[in-house]
A protein has these predicted regions:
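Bacterial flagellar/type III secretion structural subunits and associated motility module proteins
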Residues: 1, 9-187
Length: 188
């Protein structure tokens, strides 16, 4: 129904409430796996008002963006990064899973070159100087370690846009749960 009016047949429905709650949580749910600390939409000045609408404090956005420009990727772009500048981490395809994974490197010459690596506790495949992820979580992750590189963490982050896209897909795909609810009410 309209604001303040009688609700329709889906008013109070648990599925509809769960969709609304998921959308409302956008401003409070941390965006993880981009760096050691999570990134919040509120860091960029995005706030939920009492009526449920969103607003942006442009000064807070500008200040945070100036001091943390790479954090903006958490809103717009899926990203694979390393916790150390001596290690280049990239992702190909879409089989790898968002997460923060420990990378361990093996060297027999005081870390001048590397003969083996594990990521997410699984051995990586070494191919032409590139270590390739070979576990369920890291398939498609490529690591190139420069001389002197330490063990570190690899961050695989799913952006806010990507998360919203997945949510939209689950809600809008034909035959989804909400279609089934509507069809049930239409049949009655």
């Amino acid at each position: 129904g309209t604001e303040g009016g009688d609700g329709g047949p889906l008013r109070g429905d648990t599925l509809v409430r769960s969709y609304i709650n998921r959308l409302r949580s956008v401003t409070t749910t941390p965006i993880s796996n981009y760096k050691d600390d999570p990134i919040y939409l509120s860091n960029f000045g995005v706030m939920t008002e009492l009526d449920g609408s969103l607003s942006i404090d442009t000064l807070k956005f500008s200040d945070y963006f100036k001091s943390n420009p790479s954090d903006f990727a958490a809103l717009t772009k899926n990203r694979v990064t390393s916790g150390n500048a001596l290690i280049q981490a990239t992702g190909t395809g879409s089989l790898y899973k968002a997460g923060t994974y420990d990378l361990s490197l093996t060297s027999s010459d005081n870390r001048q070159s590397f003969t083996a690596a594990t990521l997410d506790g699984a051995a990586m495949v070494l191919e032409n100087g590139t270590f390739k992820g070979d576990s369920t979580n890291t398939l498609g992750i490529n690591i190139v370690a420069a001389s002197g590189a330490p063990d570190t963490r690899i961050f695989i982050g799913n952006s806010l846009i990507s998360s919203l896209r997945e949510f939209s897909k689950s809600v809008l795909t034909p035959g989804n749960a909400i279609d089934n609810k509507i069809s049930t009410y239409s049949d009655e």
